[in-house]
């Protein structure tokens, strides 16, 4: 093919007028020879450049191959026989969901109309991939939740679908939990606990929680226990995902440019931290130190960790009693001003962004309570975030811009926060942000009011609760990511975590303090790089 192109004249891209005719010392004939052969010379040079580029890339891949093989071998050794077990389970899950897809496909082809996109994509479609993840169990459910909470990293169709990846699982029989407790404690559980309630308070994919009472001190506690086999499955699954990502990056440079392995490492680190209860205990202790250092122990708390009966698979914590920040009637029975309680929660959380090693990154109503003694209780530190001063500096400007509706400043802050390799039109970006943020007002919080008459009296209790639509909240993330990506911006995951917590607080504000502007009220002190010791004044 190259020879015929060299000989022919069917290459209109190469015009003689674009190039100087070769100079010669003597004779017109030599000039003509130079001109006649120039077309072939240019094509040969371009072919040579392409060949050099291919050779260079091939050489680069060959140099990377030993490292890839080493990673695969080492990962396989670390995985061990449990990898075979998970492979069999994976095949079973694949066959099950594949059969479901084929059944849906046959129904769709027999009906009139075109084939839906989720059927065209097969098991790679968001719908069937989510179903496959759920069949694969705990690791993949957690992975699905990671996808749902990271609109800055994944396509919107997958983020939306994985909102349905619920972390609910049937409880493990108590005899298995008892066995784990005895193994981890190294002695009969009766020597540590006066009793353990065999009925779990909660059960999720990786752990379940039981109420208990300590022997001797008679203190009420909760025990969080990692379910049996979770660690083996988790290591095997994460190692498999890592190997696949390494192979993809090796085969296609495109995956390398999208930092696929980096994303997988982030997922692996996040998930391994969540199943290491020693790490969660450290997160709790860090938060409690922050409260003590800032003099906030009278305003907020976190559960005490009982280290002598805790381990990597078991976490024994003080049992706190209170109500979620969404239970308005109960809050009113505990404090005279729900608004002040909310302001306290906001100040404590904002202060932790810079004054604590990590911030609580899951402040939904189940994890943020008003306790019986009037303090704010922060629960469940399995998911935390860490933010760099540089990112938070941009976030400060972003939040201030939201409050003042200065969209050019907002655009500037997002450009500073995001990673991009091209120039961004700040004014056009600001106009798009203004259109998008007008939709926030449409994210109405539903306040449900219920009345109940007492059985032995004529009194009537009125309870108000706020209902927050997670899909609406994530729709806002996706809109922001969509607009930003159109300008080539990519944000760190911490940005999505921060924004989600702020939206939780926005919903609490609508219920507990409708007239409060949490970004402008002088009683609320937003963390600043310029100060980390000014939060005490916010509580006086």
UniProtKB/Swiss-Prot annotation:
Major subcellular site: plastid
Catalytic activity, EC: 2.7.-.-
Keyword Hydrolase: no
Active-site annotation: 362 (proton acceptor)
Protein family membership: Belongs to the protein kinase superfamily. ADCK protein kinase family.
Single Gene Ontology MF annotation: ATP binding
Superkingdom, natural source: Eukaryota
Cellular compartment(s): Plastid, Chloroplast, Plastoglobule
Boundaries of the annotated transit peptide in chain numbering: 1-58
Name listed for the protein in its UniProt record: Uncharacterized aarF domain-containing protein kinase At5g05200, chloroplastic
Binding site for ATP: 201-209, 224
CDD domains linked to this entry: ABC1_ADCK3-like
A GO cellular component entry from the record: chloroplast
């Amino acid at each position: 093919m190259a020879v015929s192109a060299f000989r022919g004249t069917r290459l209109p891209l190469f015009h003689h007028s674009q190039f100087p005719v070769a100079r010669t010392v003597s004779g017109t004939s030599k000039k003509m020879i130079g001109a006649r052969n120039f077309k072939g010379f240019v094509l040969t040079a371009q072919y040579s450049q392409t060949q050099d580029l291919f050779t260079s890339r091939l050489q680069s891949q060959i140099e990377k191959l030993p490292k890839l093989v080493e990673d695969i071998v080492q990962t396989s050794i670390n995985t061990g026989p449990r990898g075979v077990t998970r492979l069999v389970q994976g095949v079973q899950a694949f066959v099950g969901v594949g059969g479901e897809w084929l059944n849906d496909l046959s129904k769709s082809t027999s009906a009139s109309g075109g084939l839906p996109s989720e059927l065209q994509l097969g098991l790679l479609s968001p719908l069937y991939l989510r179903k496959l993840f759920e069949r694969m169990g705990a690791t993949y459910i957690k992975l699905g939740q990671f996808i749902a909470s990271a609109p800055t990293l994944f396509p919107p169709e997958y983020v939306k679908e994985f909102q349905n990846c619920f972390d609910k699982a049937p409880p493990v029989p108590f005899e298995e939990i008892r066995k784990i407790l005895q193994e981890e404690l190294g002695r009969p559980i009766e020597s540590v606990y006066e009793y353990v309630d065999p009925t779990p308070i909660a059960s999720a994919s990786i752990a379940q929680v039981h109420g208990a009472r300590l022997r001797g001190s008679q203190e009420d506690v909760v025990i969080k226990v990692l379910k049996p086999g979770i660690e083996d499955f988790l290591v095997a699954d994460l190692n498999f995902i890592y190997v696949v990502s390494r192979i993809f990056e090796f085969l296609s440079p495109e995956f390398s440019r999208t930092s696929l392995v980096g994303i997988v490492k982030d997922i692996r680190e996040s998930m391994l931290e969540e199943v290491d209860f020693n790490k969660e205990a450290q997160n709790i202790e860090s938060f409690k130190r922050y409260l003590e250092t800032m003099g906030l122990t009278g305003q907020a708390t976190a559960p005490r960790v009982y280290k002598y009966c805790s381990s990597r698979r078991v976490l024994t914590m003080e049992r706190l009693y209170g109500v979620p920040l969404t239970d308005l009637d109960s809050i009113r029975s505990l404090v005279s001003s729900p608004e002040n309680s909310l302001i306290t929660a906001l100040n404590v959380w904002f202060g932790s962004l810079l004054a604590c090693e990590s911030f609580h990154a899951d402040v939904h109503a189940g994890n943020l309570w008003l306790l019986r003694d009037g303090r704010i209780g922060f629960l469940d530190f399995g998911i935390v975030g860490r933010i760099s001063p540089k990112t938070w500096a941009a976030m400060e400007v972003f939040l201030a811009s939201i409050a003042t509706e200065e969209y050019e400043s907002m655009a500037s802050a997002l450009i500073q926060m995001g990673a991009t390799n091209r120039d961004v039109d700040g004014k056009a970006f600001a106009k798009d942000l203004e259109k998008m943020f007008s939709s926030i007002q449409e994210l109405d919080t539903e306040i449900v009011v219920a009345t109940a008459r007492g059985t032995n009296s004529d009194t009537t209790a009125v309870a108000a609760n706020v209902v927050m639509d997670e899909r609406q909240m994530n729709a806002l993330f996706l809109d922001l990511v969509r607009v930003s990506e159109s300008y080539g911006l990519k944000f760190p995951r911490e940005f999505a975590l921060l924004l989600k917590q702020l939206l939780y607080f926005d919903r609490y504000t609508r219920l507990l303090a409708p007239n409060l502007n949490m970004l402008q009220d002088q009683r609320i002190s937003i963390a600043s790089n310029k100060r980390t010791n000014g939060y005490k004044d916010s509580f006086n």
